[in-house]
């Protein structure tokens, strides 16, 4: 009888031990789950400035910036084009609404047509104020379109200094000046699009190069800058520049792209080639 009386007591003790083990196991599992969740949450909160070399698109498909009639121009300016002879420009050149006298290029520097709004300007110029008005209007529309794109894939990449980086397709935005002190690569396919929004100036150091890789096309690259653009001596640039102010090319700098300035373009023995 004494043995039978002890059985319920042992059963209670065993059940208690099993319950404690189960609770410890559940607590351990919950702790691991919470740790995993916290790590994931922290990683998801990292800004795009944490990406050191390149990155991936957010999933949005970028449409090209429509340049309209302005697409025919290698250089288009509202207030004039100055030049230190001899530059080599492939593509049309124009200035409006400023007088043609503000186009200081010589005819043998341009493989294309020089357009002016009046009878002044280089001897080989063609006067076509209507075409220039349309082109300059399209330049403004293109600038606004590029500046108005939302939800950037990268915000303030490199804290505004992107030397040494490889830039994959997407929408990039900097809320201040952008500096390119060393070579960069733009890598993607022939149909990919890049739009770079710069709230300040864009400065490229001397002898620095932008290289295209993987089939990337200069015609699909757009640099929208609220401030001035300066390309250092002997540097090489790729893409279409849409500047709200001026574009200054230092001695022997080159660009495979277009230069569209809402003020002046300054040349010093430069090479400008409209992309195909």
From Swiss-Prot:
Gene Ontology annotations for the cellular component aspect, listed alphabetically: extracellular region
Domain of life: Bacteria
Signal peptide coordinates: 1-24
Placement of sequence motif Ice-binding site motif (T-A/G-X-T/N) 1: 79-82
Cited InterPro entries: Ice-bd_prot
Disulfides per UniProt: 107-124
Thermal dependence summary for this entry: Active at low temperatures, even below 0 degree Celsius. Thermal denaturation midpoint (Tm) is 56.4 degrees Celsius.
Site note Ice-binding, residues: 251
Pfam family, one: Ice_binding
Similarity comment text for this entry: Belongs to the ice-binding protein family.
Cited function: Has antifreeze activity for survival in a subzero environment. Binds to the surface of ice crystals and inhibits their growth. Has high thermal hysteresis (TH) activity, which is the ability to lower the freezing point of an aqueous solution below its melting point, and thus the freezing of the cell fluid can be prevented protecting the organism from ice damage. The TH activity of this protein is 2.2 degrees Celsius at 5 uM and 2.5 degrees Celsius at 50 uM.
Domain text: The ice-binding site is formed by three T-A/G-X-T/N motifs.
Subunit structure: Monomer.
Protein name as annotated: Ice-binding protein
